[in-house]
């Protein structure tokens, strides 16, 4: 039973809304005529140095990483002459949560942009961005490597504008950070209560009579090729094991989930996409971008599409070639059905989550504080929460909470606490035996340079080259406890000094493939607004997302009901829509 409900004022909801949709002015000057960083008292404007003005999407990752990289870059170039009569460089930034149009970029006074979301192909086709191809393909002055060498084939095609055979690479932006929505678990609570699946043939928790943990979702244990497969030992390997664990938590007086209220709908919606991606794998997920290719795991429907064909209670799976005649069949992918069932089981049982789990006056920072303090002597409630739905960047966002707790007792510092990034469970035993792990990056984060800069252009380009160097990538991870979207090795020093959460995230990333939710296929670019992960599974069944609809049980009473209605919607878009594939 829940013993304490946090009553947050309506004012807090207003603040949350303001924060979520706030925008920054397009390079408004400070009183001294400078731009950016006006609030940083230890960094006064210095007109004896070349100025580079940065805009950053300042949300969950915050901007401490940027302050540190700016300082390092300034030190490395303190004697560099970028402009006649000036020596050295000063980098200053502003930031908020905002998506930029091409005209916004052209009319701003910023030189470099760290973006999240936004239409990259609209920007590059409008002439708003600088061609940075030579920067990407030349050896860097900071690590003697090309940035291109740290990118995968999909990134090269997307950022390089390779839209067809024979098209030459031309870069106007580069990857930035990488973020996934997932489950964070309180390892301290898991350890205290023994919330680990045992290696018994029948599903059970570890106990005095059997303290041996299962091998977890990856099906392995021990260390191999720099990966510690034992870090997920005992974590639930399948959906059924996961919800068995939730039931055991309730029996022991622990609430399984902390949900972020105002953002619960959005966060769980992205978690749903992560579950789909984990099920489908890279190749099958790409069908959601291209709508061309061989689909191998479509759920078979009856002749009029109103029911799922089942055998022994499970959906029958079939294959099909996807093209312009049947693009809608991608919405029969089995991963979507099973992920919907996971969401249904998660949100329809109110005892599974905090009372403010869907209260819009309760924010993600409220949730972070309650989750972090849960089980400690600083909690205002005796309620304990085992898991939290948030992004892989959550520790950077919750930094103030950790710091305030550490001021009262060092044992509560971020370094000394023990949270973990949970490997997602598999839909069933068959998917578990396949052994695939996929990290969904849905942020569309990028760094780019404004076109037609003046005397500071070289400094701006150098800064972008620097932030993509190995040392800067490593420092980003060290500061944020999160990842950049490049192929780089976190240094031994950074890993050894990292807290437990960071190690679990790095380890999970090492053993997983990454699926980036963007594409430069013509069909996707034309219909991007409908096909984004935040939108694609929200427009077929109204009103709301799978999360609220399955929670309320009105528009769709079950995962199967929602699945069929969503498929029907995309099929009804008709040949005029799908022929463009």
Specify the residue positions occupied by each region the protein language model found.
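C-terminal capping/gating helix-and-loop segments adjacent to ligand/active sites or protein-protein/ligand interfaces
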Residues: 480, 502-581
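Extracytoplasmic/periplasmic substrate-recognition and gating elements
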Residues: 85, 165-169, 225-226, 383-384, ...
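Glycine-centered hinge/linker elements that transmit conformational signals in sensory
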Residues: 244-246, 283-366, 424
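Short, low-complexity disordered leader/linker segments with a strong preference
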Residues: 1-51, 575-581
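Extracytoplasmic "Venus flytrap"/periplasmic binding protein-like
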Residues: 78-158, 192-193, 379, 386-387, ...
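Short, polar/charged alpha-helical segment
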Residues: 59-85, 184, 188, 271-275
């Amino acid at each position: 039973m829940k013993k304490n409900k946090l009553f947050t004022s309506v004012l807090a909801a207003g603040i949350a809304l303001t924060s979520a949709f706030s925008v920054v002015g397009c390079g408004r000057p400070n009183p001294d005529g400078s731009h950016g960083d006006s609030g940083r008292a230890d960094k006064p404007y210095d007109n004896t140095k070349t100025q580079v003005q940065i805009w950053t999407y300042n949300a969950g990752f915050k901007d401490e990483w940027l302050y540190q990289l700016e300082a390092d870059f300034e030190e490395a170039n303190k004697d560099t002459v970028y402009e006649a009569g000036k020596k050295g460089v000063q980098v200053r930034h502003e930031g908020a949560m905002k998506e930029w149009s091409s005209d916004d970029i052209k009319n701003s006074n910023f030189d470099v942009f760290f973006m999240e979301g936004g239409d990259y192909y609209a920007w590059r086709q409008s002439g708003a961005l600088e061609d940075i191809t030579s920067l990407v393909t030349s050896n860097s002055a900071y690590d003697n490597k090309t940035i291109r060498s740290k990118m995968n084939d999909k990134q090269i095609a997307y950022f390089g504008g390779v839209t067809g055979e024979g098209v030459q690479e031309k870069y106007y932006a580069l990857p930035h950070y990488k973020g996934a929505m997932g489950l964070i678990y309180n390892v301290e609570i898991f350890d205290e209560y023994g919330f680990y699946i045992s290696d018994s043939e029948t599903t059970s928790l570890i106990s005095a009579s059997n303290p041996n943990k299962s091998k977890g979702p990856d099906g392995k244990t021990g260390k191999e090729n720099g990966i510690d497969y034992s870090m997920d030992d005992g974590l639930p390997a399948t959906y059924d094991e996961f919800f068995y664990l939730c039931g055991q938590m309730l029996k022991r007086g622990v609430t399984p989930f902390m949900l972020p209220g105002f953002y619960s709908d959005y966060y769980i919606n992205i978690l749903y996409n992560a579950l789909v991606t984990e099920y489908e794998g890279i190749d099958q997920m790409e069908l959601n971008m291209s709508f061309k290719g061989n689909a191998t795991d479509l759920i078979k429907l009856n002749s009029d599409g109103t029911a799922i064909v089942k055998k022994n209670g499970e959906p029958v799976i079939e294959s099909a070639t996807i093209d312009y005649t049947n693009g809608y069949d991608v919405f029969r992918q089995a991963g979507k059905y099973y992920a919907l069932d996971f969401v249904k089981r998660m949100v329809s049982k109110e005892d599974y989550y905090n009372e403010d789990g869907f209260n819009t006056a309760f924010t993600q920072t409220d949730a972070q504080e309650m989750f972090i303090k849960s089980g400690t002597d600083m909690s205002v409630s005796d309620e304990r929460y085992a898991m939290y739905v948030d992004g892989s960047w959550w520790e950077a966002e919750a930094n103030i909470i950790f710091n305030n707790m550490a001021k009262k007792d060092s044992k509560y510092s971020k370094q000394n606490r023990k949270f973990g990034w949970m490997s997602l469970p598999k839909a069933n035993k068959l998917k578990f035996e396949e052994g695939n792990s996929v990290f969904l990056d849905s942020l569309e984060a990028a760094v780019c340079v404004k076109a037609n800069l003046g005397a500071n252009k070289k400094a701006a380009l150098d800064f972008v080259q620097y932030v993509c160097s190995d040392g800067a990538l490593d420092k980003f991870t060290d500061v944020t406890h999160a990842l950049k979207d490049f192929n780089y090795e976190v240094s031994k020093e950074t890993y050894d000094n990292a807290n437990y959460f960071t190690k679990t995230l790095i380890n999970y990333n090492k053993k997983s493939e990454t699926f980036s939710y963007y594409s430069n296929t013509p069909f996707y670019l034309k219909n991007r607004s409908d096909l984004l992960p935040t939108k694609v599974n929200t427009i077929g069944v109204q009103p709301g997302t799978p999360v609220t609809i399955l929670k309320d049980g009105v528009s769709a009473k079950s995962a199967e009901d929602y699945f069929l209605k969503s498929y029907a919607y995309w099929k009804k878009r008709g040949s005029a829509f799908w022929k463009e594939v």
